[in-house]
A protein has these predicted regions:
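Conserved catalytic motifs of ABC-family nucleotide-binding domains
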Residues: 76
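Helix N-cap at the start of a conserved alpha-helix in ABC-type nucleotide-binding domains
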Residues: 91-93
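Catalytic Walker B motif of ABC-type/P-loop ATPase nucleotide-binding domains
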Residues: 80-83
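H-loop/switch region of ABC-family ATPase nucleotide-binding domains
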Residues: 116-117
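Conserved ABC ATPase signature
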Residues: 55-59
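Conserved beta-strand-loop-alpha-helix hinge in the C-terminal portion
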Residues: 136-163
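Conserved ABC ATPase "signature" region
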Residues: 33-51
Length: 174
């Protein structure tokens, strides 16, 4: 299981992009040759080729988030958990990151679990949804089914993507 927390800066431990990715690989016992290959592959996967020797402070916030994603992906987890991964990004950066995660999901076949307050960015990608309230699961299941069950509950309706609130509102009216 690979995890990327919302406070991505707190997960960074190295000076350069390459060292950041290498750190967890070396701790997992990979050989230096395997580490080098995985560092290059991971940087390529997240759209940061040739940034291996960049200092972390030379990277933008969005690039550092993608670097952290690369360091998680380099271990090739079966499950990737992202906790508010776009919290510090502008809308274009958020859409770009989720499109990247979708490409990686399809290329590597890993399960992706996203904890997110703004589901609008996830709409093109999500297949299942879990809505929680005060720490308890209120609705879960395939996305459309869960959205339809959540809509009548006012406290959950606000959490649905805007397009689905409009769609379900029109269906209820007509």
């Amino acid at each position: 299981v690979g995890i990327m927390l919302d406070d991505y800066e707190s997960q960074m431990v190295s000076l350069t992009a390459g060292e950041e990715i290498s750190f967890s690989l070396l701790n997992h016992g990979f050989s230096p040759d395997e580490v080098d290959a995985r560092v290059k592959e991971a940087l390529n996967d997240v759209g940061l080729p040739d940034r291996e020797n960049y200092q972390l402070d030379e990277l933008s916030g969005g690039q550092r988030q993608r670097l952290l994603l690369a360091s998680v992906l380099a271990t090739r987890p079966d499950i990737l958990i992202l906790d508010e991964p776009v919290s510090a990004m502008d809308p274009d950066g958020a859409r770009s990151l989720y499109a990247l995660v979708d490409r990686i999901h399809k290329a590597h076949g890993m399960t992706v679990v996203v904890v997110e307050h703004d589901l609008n960015y996830l709409l093109p990608y999500m297949t299942h949804m879990v809505l929680m309230e005060t720490g308890k699961i209120k609705v879960q299941g395939p996305f459309e089914e869960a959205a339809r069950r959540a809509f009548p509950q006012e406290s959950l309706r606000a959490n649905l993507p805007e397009l689905w609130r409009i769609k379900l509102g029109l269906e209820a009216k007509y």
